[in-house]
């Protein structure tokens, strides 16, 4: 503002000068951060942002074994005939975390088609296998509703206890460590094959044949610093952790020993993982096996 263009009274002049000199009137560029955004705030983002691995659809009649089931807390492909998910996809950032206690309220999923058998809270009883979470309880502690959603039996797979409670849990804990260090994650987990070994020995099914025991449990984790426009920020240098674990009580407890490539998981499952990422970057990322820290 050029003051000499106007005749101002002394009071108005003093007020104008004070405003011009005030720090509130100064425009200061925000300090850059690792994400490119100042004061990047964690948000709850699209659970299926990196793509639909199996092309699942909400058509229960024609695709009962690749049924798309979307919830606020996660998205999955569910298999009616196997009584478990093919895969579950979710976003994890500090925005999903809070102080809600573990609810332990295992329950049948009433949102599955009414004509389908719904696996119940006691369906795994006496089987020798844990009710193994795909999307873990501790990833959804922002509210009782969020945590309770992880205890729906549609989110479970029959998992050997050593795998569920130690090896698989170790990676789950490490994922939350990454979040506490300023990252956000996109996670896809699932299982495939038939036949695992629990505390009662080898089995191919439980619950009178209505739930398939998988031979392998797998997970893919894409790690990004907190920011926005997440898919466009994925580069050939983005850290991607992929693991493939045998579903057996004889499994080792160090999750890092079971790291593999995304390509290897795709070959085993037939899925197209990270399909929303550009094909060039996808090819580069999926051929690598992570060798980063594990704790």
Outline where the language-model segments fall.
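Domain-level detector for secreted/extracellular nuclease and nuclease-toxin modules, and
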Residues: 3-7, 21-295
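Alpha-helical hydrophobic membrane-insertion segments
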Residues: 9-12
């Amino acid at each position: 503002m050029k003051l000499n263009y106007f005749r101002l009274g002394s009071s108005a002049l003093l007020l104008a000068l004070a405003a011009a000199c005030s720090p509130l009137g100064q425009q200061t560029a925000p300090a850059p951060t690792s994400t490119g955004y100042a004061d990047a705030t964690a948000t709850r983002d699209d659970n299926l942002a990196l793509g639909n691995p199996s092309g699942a659809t909400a058509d229960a009649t024609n695709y009962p074994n690749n049924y798309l089931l979307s919830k606020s807390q996660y998205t999955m492909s569910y298999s009616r005939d196997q009584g478990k998910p093919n895969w579950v996809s979710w976003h994890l950032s500090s925005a999903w975390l809070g102080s809600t206690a573990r609810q332990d309220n295992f329950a049948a999923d009433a949102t599955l088609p009414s004509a389908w058998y719904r696996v119940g809270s006691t369906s795994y009883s006496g089987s020798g296998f844990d009710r193994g979470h795909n999307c873990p309880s501790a990833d959804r502690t922002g509210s009782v509703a969020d945590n309770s959603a992880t205890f729906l039996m549609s989110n479970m797979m029959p998992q050997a206890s050593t795998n569920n409670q130690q090896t698989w849990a170790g990676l789950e804990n490490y994922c939350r460590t990454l979040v506490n260090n300023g990252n956000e994650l996109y996670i896809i987990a699932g299982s495939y094959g038939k036949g695992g070994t629990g505390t009662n020995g080898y089995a191919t099914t439980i619950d009178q044949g209505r739930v398939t025991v998988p031979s392998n449990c797998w997970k893919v984790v894409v790690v990004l610093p907190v920011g926005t426009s997440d898919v466009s920020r994925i580069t050939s240098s983005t850290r991607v952790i992929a693991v493939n674990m045998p579903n057996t009580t004889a499994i080792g407890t160090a999750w890092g020993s079971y790291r593999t490539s995304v390509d290897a998981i795709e070959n085993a499952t037939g899925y197209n993982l990270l399909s929303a990422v550009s094909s060039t970057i996808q090819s580069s990322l999926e051929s690598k096996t992570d060798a980063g820290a594990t704790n």
